[in-house]
């Protein structure tokens, strides 16, 4: 995957078929689970990639239906569709030709897994007029995952965390890094570092309130009001050696760093991690701005944190059933929130979705 449009495809492919062994710098091979902390569910499986989206995004049903048919003809054991309509989907495809393809898939024995969608709860979509006016259903799962002959997949959050992290107050906090070269990875700052967490959105005056304390430290600020590029540029201009944006809602952030002029590391943390930092750091105030200072440790390599839980919790983005046919949809729920897998350029990252 050498395009610049994102690395969702690489991430999903790594989950499905990531290699069992990875070549090392000396030419030897080592187990992926030991060196990269991840491998595919079906490691080393052959993967066919079928492009159905245009450069500007969006896919026609004729394109992905043709891809399903091609996969069946080629003898694929399974197919994955990381796509779906934003509005609640119907139970059957209205086009007889498409319905025939779906029925042929069932008879062929090929398993076709389709995302139930990332539309979340029904009420989250009402401002966008996605639910049909005449509908009394609270379903939000889109087509083709809503079709009778599809296998719709919903998402639960991972009970553990894998990836690069910072550590503070005895807690490993796994950050999300969506930046690319020439921006340095956060691991370039491995070891103990000072931080200044400005409890504001990252305007120039927000960082200025911390004065010289920010110089040579990692800057932290909250998501909101201004774009991610401005936050990072403002932090670097104030003397920060790296920037961390804390989410203002549950979940992770897939930040766009287009326009970021610095090379200093730029990553994001969850709201929950930000709250832990504020609760355990030294609190200060200047010019009407509250900020927190302390020292954290940047991990030099990926780590694992397995949390104790009696059960999984549904991902807040996962679409809900049930379609108009009253069939059990989606059929399967599996971990899709905060999954560690491939990133473009030979790296690894956490991403979330129902794919």
Predicted regions and their residues:
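Short acidic, glycine-rich surface-loop motifs adjacent to enzyme active sites
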Residues: 54, 68-92, 115-116, 216-217, ...
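Alpha-helical scaffolding within the catalytic cores
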Residues: 28-36, 62-67, 135-139, 312
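Divalent metal-dependent hydrolysis catalytic cores, especially in the metallo-beta-lactamase
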Residues: 11, 76-86, 103-118, 240
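Structured lumen-facing ectodomains of secretory-pathway proteins
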Residues: 1, 108-112, 116-330, 344
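Short pre-catalytic strand/loop immediately N-terminal to key active-site residues, enriched for Gly-Thr
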Residues: 2-5, 345-354
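Active-site-adjacent bridging/hinge elements
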Residues: 333-344
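Subtilisin-like serine protease catalytic core
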Residues: 1-60, 74-77, 107-109, 146-150, ...
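Hydrophobic, small-residue-rich alpha-helical packing segments that form membrane-like cores
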Residues: 60-61, 66-73, 77, 87, ...
